[in-house]
């Protein structure tokens, strides 16, 4: 009887080990790849992204692409009207070292791709319906051979952000399944979080939850919340670059220190989508919580 029980135990352990070996593991997710938005005024959008921000436009799959570097870019949907009048965000995207393995890993967690793997990328929906695209590192991305723009006001996307209603549900996906890590959290009041930043598991870029938005946010409010951030070394130098690109309006020179201690400057595209210039490192102690991760730099672009 003891031999039978011992044999059964060994068989059970072997089966458990085999199942564990067969379970897909999550490959590295290294940073932000792109942010995609709708525009209802392509000509004005070109003046903003092309002239004011200084990025040179390319086209692929019916969209406008503005390379920030050879692995990060901004996408604009110009031919399809936004599905909602109060929102312009279409997708956020992150780079992975193995898109196929990540797709299998997410399927093993019950998350089916809405856009199956094709041309080095696939897309899923997070718990609140945001389209999240994962891009294969080293794939033939349209920006991979793009030369640096001489008028570019930044060469790094450091984070993307969007409105979140249920933080616990989002955490289960972004932190629990994808492995994103806490970076910083805070808000206008020290004891209430309006912004929660979580870094990619294998890099320094981050996703920012924008909390406490109320039941019916307007397009203007959504434009502030659903945003992307361009990293810069020096905000005064950025202001000079914007002036050189003929940036018009008070916002072109209006920098401030955020609650996280980093200098920032906000501009808005013709559809009221916010572009946040932000210095890579804080210049003073942050409010509300300490940073718990490494800050991005100009030289660690997501490749």
Identify the meaning behind each predicted range.
Residues 38, 93-95, 163, 229-231:
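Short hydrophobic/aromatic beta-strand micro-patches
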Residues 21-27, 103-156, 161-162, 183-200, ...:
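Vicinal oxygen chelate
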Residues 45-47, 99-105, 235-242:
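Short amphipathic alpha-helices within nucleic acid-binding modules
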Residues 5-17:
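Bacterial N-terminal signal peptides
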Residues 68-109:
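Mid-chain, structured segments of secreted extracytoplasmic proteins
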Residues 27, 33-74, 108, 120-123, ...:
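Core segments of cupin and vicinal oxygen chelate
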Residues 30-34, 71, 87-91, 155-159, ...:
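Short, solvent-exposed beta-strand edge segments and adjacent coil->beta transition regions
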């Amino acid at each position: 009887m003891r031999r039978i029980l011992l044999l059964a135990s060994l068989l059970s352990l072997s089966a458990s080990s085999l199942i564990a070996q067969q379970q897909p593991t999550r490959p590295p997710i290294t940073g932000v790849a792109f942010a995609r938005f709708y525009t209802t005024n392509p000509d004005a959008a070109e003046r903003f992204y092309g002239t004011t921000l200084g990025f040179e436009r390319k086209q692929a799959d019916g969209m406008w692409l503005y390379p920030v570097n050879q692995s990060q870019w901004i996408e604009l949907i110009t031919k399809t009207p936004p599905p909602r009048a109060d929102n312009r965000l279409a997708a956020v995207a992150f780079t992975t070292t193995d898109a196929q393995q990540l797709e299998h890993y997410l399927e093993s967690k019950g998350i089916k791709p809405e856009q199956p793997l094709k041309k080095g990328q696939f897309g899923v929906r997070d718990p609140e319906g945001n389209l999240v695209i994962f891009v294969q590192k080293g794939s033939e991305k349209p920006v991979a051979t793009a030369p640096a723009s001489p008028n570019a006001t930044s060469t790094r996307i450091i984070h993307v952000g969007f409105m979140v209603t249920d933080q616990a549900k989002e955490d289960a996906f972004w932190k629990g399944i994808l492995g994103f890590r806490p970076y910083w959290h805070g808000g206008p009041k020290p004891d209430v979080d309006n912004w929660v930043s979580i870094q990619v598991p294998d890099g320094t870029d981050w996703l920012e939850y924008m909390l406490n938005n109320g039941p019916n946010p307007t397009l203007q409010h959504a434009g502030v919340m659903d945003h992307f951030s361009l990293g810069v070394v020096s905000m005064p130098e950025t202001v000079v670059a914007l002036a050189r690109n003929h940036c018009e309006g008070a916002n072109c020179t209006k920098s401030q220190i955020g609650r996280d201690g980093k200098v920032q400057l906000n501009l808005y595209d013709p559809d009221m989508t916010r572009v946040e210039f932000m210095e890579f490192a804080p210049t003073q102690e942050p409010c509300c919580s300490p940073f718990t991760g490494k800050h991005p730099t100009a030289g660690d672009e997501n490749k």
